[in-house]
């Protein structure tokens, strides 16, 4: 059941990212990727702030990063993340 809810949340996130129009502006196309920006730490939480049964130890230990060039080592791609108008891969371990 927890897996189903987690997968549903990731699917909804993917649909939301695809639904938002990506607008290319002159400034954006001129902007080069800055060094060090490919590894942005992301906090991932599920449920309400007071906690639910979803926030068990296995989910609290989930660490995710927004990466531009693919996941590293033991990480797996779990969707996408956005910084401004740029899309990155959401890599979690």
Curated annotation (Swiss-Prot):
Q: Any idea what this protein is called?
A: Alpha-defensin 6/12
As given in the record, the signal peptide range reads 1-19
Q: Please give the residue ranges the record annotates as the region Disordered.
A: 23-54
Highest taxon of the lineage: Eukaryota
Where is it expressed, tissue-wise? Paneth cells of the small bowel.
User: Which gene does this sequence derive from?
Assistant: Defa6
- Indicate the residues removed as propeptide on maturation: 20-60
Which pairs of Cys residues are joined through disulfide bonds in the record? 64-92, 66-81, 71-91
Subcellular localization, as worded in the UniProt entry: Secreted
* SMART domains to which the protein is assigned, alphabetical: Defensin_propep (SM01418), DEFSN (SM00048)
Q: What exactly does this protein do?
A: Has broad-spectrum antimicrobial properties. Has antibacterial activity against the Gram-positive bacterium L.monocytogenes EGD and the Gram-negative bacteria E.coli ML-35p and avirulent S.typhimurium 7953, but not against the mouse-virulent S.typhimurium 14028S. Probably contributes to the antimicrobial barrier function of the small bowel mucosa.
The record's keywords, sorted A to Z, are: Antibiotic, Antimicrobial, Defensin, Disulfide bond, Secreted, Signal
SUPFAM superfamilies, per this entry?
Answer: Defensin-like
Task: Name residues in a coiled coil.
Answer: none
A Pfam family matched in the record: Defensin_1
Q: What is its main location?
A: secreted
């Amino acid at each position: 059941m927890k897996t189903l809810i987690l997968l549903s949340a990731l699917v909804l996130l993917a649909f939301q990212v695809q639904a938002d129009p990506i607008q290319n502006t002159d400034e954006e196309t001129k902007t080069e990727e800055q060094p060090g920006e490919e590894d942005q730490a992301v906090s991932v939480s599920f449920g309400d702030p007071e906690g639910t049964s979803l926030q068990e130890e296995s989910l609290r230990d989930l660490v995710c990063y927004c990466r531009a060039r693919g996941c590293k080592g033991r990480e797996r791609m779990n969707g996408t993340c956005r910084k401004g108008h740029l899309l990155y891969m959401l890599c979690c371990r």
